Amino acid sequence: MKTKILSLANEEVGEITLNKDIFAVEFIRDDIIKQVIDWQRAKAMSGNHKTKTVSEVSGTTKKPFKQKGTGNARQGSLRSIQMRGGGISHGPKVRSHAIKLPKKVRKLGLIHALSEKCAAGKLLIINSLKLEKPKTSVLVNLLNKFQGQSFFIIDGNKVDTNFSLATKNIYNTLIVPQIGANVYDIIRHEYVLLSQEAVSFLEERLR
């Protein structure tokens, strides 16, 4: 499958042949894409929510008042779950929210996400992702030529330092090395920009 190679100024500078088994899958499996996104988001959850049980609440163990004669319901501890400031029954505990997903499914999810963007005309191949200076204004002017609202940019093994610094203050723009390519960011951004080096790495990784 042949497609254009563009410059950062959105000018055609050449042509590249993409692997159709990675960038042009015939039937897009949205269910697989969703599974991978759910797996990613679950794994990203911190899981550090925690409440104290009766045994963990700090306080006295003394009986608050005598058993009979006060007119109140009998109480044995100020730390009981029904008391203000007492322990919490069946509250959240620190745990991992991660779920298991086979590597083959994760790989398929990335292939189908790339194919979906390619089919929509939102996956662009860029000849070079390098800037002479880390100027945000320069990069904003270049990205404006693509007329997109958000950009997920994937470079080769290493991201250009100036380019990375220039993206820091740009809303909804993210750049990662090829190892950081993931389904969630591909789907949530309007445009996906790939360097030629990234294409080679992804085709090798997903074949």
From Swiss-Prot:
GO terms for molecular function: rRNA binding; structural constituent of ribosome. InterPro entries: Ribosomal_uL4, Ribosomal_uL4-like, Ribosomal_uL4_dom_sf. Gene3D superfamilies: 3.40.1370.10. The keyword Nucleus does not apply. Residues 50-76 are annotated as: Disordered. GO terms for biological process: translation. Coiled coil: none annotated. Keywords: Ribonucleoprotein, Ribosomal protein, RNA-binding, rRNA-binding. It comes from the Bacteria. Pfam families: Ribosomal_L4. SUPFAM superfamilies: Ribosomal protein L4. One of its GO terms (cellular component) is ribonucleoprotein complex. Belongs to the universal ribosomal protein uL4 family. HAMAP family: Ribosomal_uL4_B. One of the primary rRNA binding proteins, this protein initially binds near the 5'-end of the 23S rRNA. It is important during the early stages of 50S assembly. It makes multiple contacts with different domains of the 23S rRNA in the assembled 50S subunit and ribosome. Part of the 50S ribosomal subunit. This is Large ribosomal subunit protein uL4.
